[in-house]
């Protein structure tokens, strides 16, 4: 079994790690950074990933996709999708299956596809470091992700060419990294406020056992929301001062978003920051500049309610675990937003203790995923991880009632069966509608999917016995079966979200990803070939100008002919042809090199390199070792 990498697929940034010996290690990307922006851009037929995509966002906002994790596994009609539509510069569109997809460069992409591009970058980063092919990974998700979101994340891994051995909850991964080398038993809380989601998990750890007691959260609360508050504040201040509303200017909005993110980070260590955006827009009177002094106090006031929203999940998680805040012996902070002093204050106030800051909040989740990868390929032993399902699972019964089969915070993997019956006489088929959530009416919860059990023998209502079984695997993904006990007929399904990608769509996306990887490689080869050729043309022309008269007419003619042949194909898209002409010119230009060397030798003053024996001085020396 090869190396299993751990990937933190984040809303804002992603990170990849691997076990090296007995320790997990974060792998730096090609740019030398330990995290990679979770941003994809499409420009002039080219796909950009990470930092290169982020750099061009200001000039290409409608084709730059970020924070797609907030859309993954969501239906287009989801209120959270509408919320996102109002703030992102790219188009969110309705897919044929009803899911929320994105549109860029006149093409439609599923959030799983966009996520796959990021995962491919993580995979390549690991392969470049390890020097070997990587095919297996552990990928993290927010603890409060539902089945559809988990399945969509697993699909993203498959599209990226990875076998996803395990989907692991982010707070659980963080706890693994925190407690990996600690023997003492503790009850800890992991407070994870990242770029797009918030989770809190309560765990008991000790002697290599990591047992999640409860988890709660909000899959649409994170740093992106904090950025939006600053962005709206800047727009309002600028409108008040200039009378111009920047909300309809995509380029200005992208600059404002970057400025908001920068200001947010600066205010974690400074109490005030200056936001200067020259030439943000223009009107009939000329260009306009934005120059605002922004204080930490103003920022805290803008986001106070967002921080307060993290408290309720903490209360629920403690209640579900049967604990009080005073029972928590350590609070581990995870996610970039936990660097904000006001967030740390809120955590301290709620739990009554100073939070633990000994882990890097941007890297700890990937490190934990790498440890879990080490467990799966037997590199790490004596670790037992017991996670839970974040939401209750059940089916819709008579009257639209949500009947739970598995309660939230049940340790997984788990299996539960219950017998139901028909609602009408002589009913020959039943539709099983599977929901996930905590509301009493099924319609108020998340519909995961549905299937039919047919061929039930005619009988009065209430007589047939239909056994429904829920099975949740270690990834938190749901499998459901329904069996008529009389006839023995059974229907089994792995729940696919009511939208979701079909197997055929996933396979097509895998092929597209492989094709893109091949085309990306070809494009890189072409660019490298053109760069090498361009450099050779320049140096050859310079050399011919300086030393052409030193060549024989035959050698000079051959060099000039090879030079013309290479220049003629420089704009071609055929890398092999460019390389062939480059090699021909390289061979021809060797004669120029010989002429250059000969000319330089002739120009040296006679005897310059001859040793002058008259000036040689004999030196006396002593062997100090013999003293």
From Swiss-Prot:
The keyword NADP does not apply. Keywords: ATP-binding, Chaperone, Nucleotide-binding, Phosphoprotein, Stress response. InterPro entries: ATPase_NBD (IPR043129), Chaperone_DnaK (IPR012725), Heat_shock_70_CS (IPR018181), HSP70_C_sf (IPR029048), HSP70_peptide-bd_sf (IPR029047), Hsp_70_fam (IPR013126). It comes from the Bacteria. Pfam families: HSP70 (PF00012). One of its GO terms (molecular function) is unfolded protein binding. Residues 600-610 have a biased composition (Polar residues). Residues 598-627 are annotated as: Disordered. Residues 612-627 have a biased composition (Basic and acidic residues). Induction: By stress conditions e.g. heat shock. The modification Phosphothreonine is found at residue 197. HAMAP family: DnaK (MF_00332). Acts as a chaperone. NCBIfam families: PRK00290.1 (NF001413), PRK05183.1 (NF003520), prok_dnaK (TIGR02350). Belongs to the heat shock protein 70 family. This is Chaperone protein DnaK. It comes from Rickettsia akari (strain Hartford). The lineage of its organism: Bacteria, Pseudomonadati, Pseudomonadota, Alphaproteobacteria, Rickettsiales. The gene is dnaK.
